[in-house]
Amino acid sequence: MININNNMKTIIILTIMILTIIIFTRTINGLQLEPVKFMNQKSGLIEIASNNLNLQSLTTSVKNGLIAKSVNLNDNFINSVSNEIYLALGVTNTNVQRMTWQVNIASNVGTMDVFYIEATIGEKFVVINFHTIQITQPMPQLYDVVEKCERTGSRRYGIAGPRARECRYHNVPRSLNTDELTLVTKTLESKVQEAIKIMLQ
């Protein structure tokens, strides 16, 4: 009877320790993020002759001009910006300003590419001034504690009875859960205004 009570106490203590480790690990990894970094800053000008431009040729020129500067934007944003520029053609000294960002989260880092475009409509040219910067959020490796038990211990009654269960605990790498993905995304998006200041200074 004494052995059973001791075993129960051991199990209870181990259970409390494991739960504490899991909660502590998830709190540290899920909430305490390193400071973000700003990198890969680029800027440049694209000039497009405005004579006899149609929407399709304008869109193609904007896309190709950005690609030539090693700036890759999604087609929806390029189409939207090009449409606004096209509607402003003929109204000289008009500015079209647009901004967007794209978030990408991998296992060890989250990134957000911020893009700012200002197009000035002139008499003969459309001048596009673009700025881009990448915000990175380093992340620690995340783990789950997994229990593996086998009946490899000594028998309860010497040579008879079932063997005692022996358990080991392993740290198994895991990916971000939904709450952690949301946290990283919000952390990156909270830096948009700071990114704009850096790009335009």
From Swiss-Prot:
The keyword Transmembrane applies. It is found in: Membrane. The keyword Transmembrane helix applies. It is a single-pass membrane protein. Keywords: Membrane, Transmembrane, Transmembrane helix. One of its GO terms (cellular component) is membrane. The chain crosses the membrane at residues 11-31. Its main location: membrane. This is Uncharacterized protein R799.
